[in-house]
Amino acid sequence: MITIKKMAELLGTSTTTVSNVIHGKEGEVSPVMVEKVKKLIEEYDYVPNRNARNLASNRSGIIGLAMKASENKYDNFVKDPFAGELIGAVERYVRAKGYFTMLYVSSDIGEIISSVSSWNVDGLILLGMQKEDGELLNQKMKKPMVFVDAYFEDVSFDYVNVGIDDRKGGREITEYLIQSGHQKIAFLADNCMGVDYQRFMGYRDALTSAGLPWNEENFIRLRPSGADMSLILSQAYDRARDFTAFICASDYYAAFILNDLKDRGMKIPEELSIVGFDDNVCSRLVRPALTTVHQDVTEKSRITVEKLFHIINDEDYGANFEQLPVFIVERSSVRKM
């Protein structure tokens, strides 16, 4: 492969001039010479040495994407289409910036910090973090960071987060069920923190506004056990006759529960209406198709990457908190009573 030195010799110019064109510093080179260098690059199919460029700029060219997932939630967190869609979109937008994405998933924040620190990343995107995780990251990591879907209350540090209006989504899907004639509505989630807590609070807001009673038994805490979904499905089945509608905190759980209840002989939505949250592929694959809350994961990923690179480049990144809108997608899983 041709070198910068050889190109400079062929063009009768300096290696600095050729290097400036290759690295986009064309303002320091005459237009005629810029065209000559570009023509030579194309002729010899020259590919810049990324390692040398990163060394010169004191950057690694790596963006870390770290996800914290409960060890008993999934045997593989990426199986959830929400996670897969976000990872794919982040990687695509990071790659468009000329960077690489390194992914790390763990239930241990200490392990995440230790591993990510060894990568010498230029910036970090963080998902699934709770308040104490954010505080530890702020103490230990001195890299540009953008959180996704974080809700840190009463913290002493500034942080940047991109999310959606989870509480509004929980409220609107509950109002939709109430307007459809439902009053006995359960909320199902595997935790009551972060985004699931916000969605749950939206559910409670809607019940309160409608004058409907609520008690703790209406919150069905799903208890996953890795790859084994049988416990969750049994939990849902045992409570299904107590309600006319289930609100699941994610399409992932809603799809599993819907299919299992049908397999056990329940008619959906005639005997039980089921709705989800996310509007991912799960909502469209099951029958009846899920009514759900839509969020634009691709746009969330794009904004996250843009903010991170603005921070890396010491540019204005806008507001610390970016909240994307949500809306109801009506399909076939809700009975009008």
Provide a role label for each language-model segment:
Residues 1-60:
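N-terminal helix-turn-helix DNA-binding module of bacterial transcription factors
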Residues 46-113:
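Amphipathic helical "hinge" segments at domain boundaries
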Residues 91-105, 204-227:
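Short beta-strand elements in bilobed, periplasmic/extracellular small-molecule ligand-binding domains
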Residues 127-169, 252, 278-290:
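Flexible loop/hinge segments that line or gate small-molecule binding clefts
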Residues 160-187, 197, 226-234, 293-313:
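Hydrophobic alpha-helical segments within soluble ligand-binding/sensing domains
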Residues 171-212, 320-333:
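An alpha-beta-alpha
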Residues 184, 214-218, 268-274:
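Short acidic capping loops at alpha-helix termini that bridge into adjacent secondary structure
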Residues 230-337:
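Flexible loop/turn connectors
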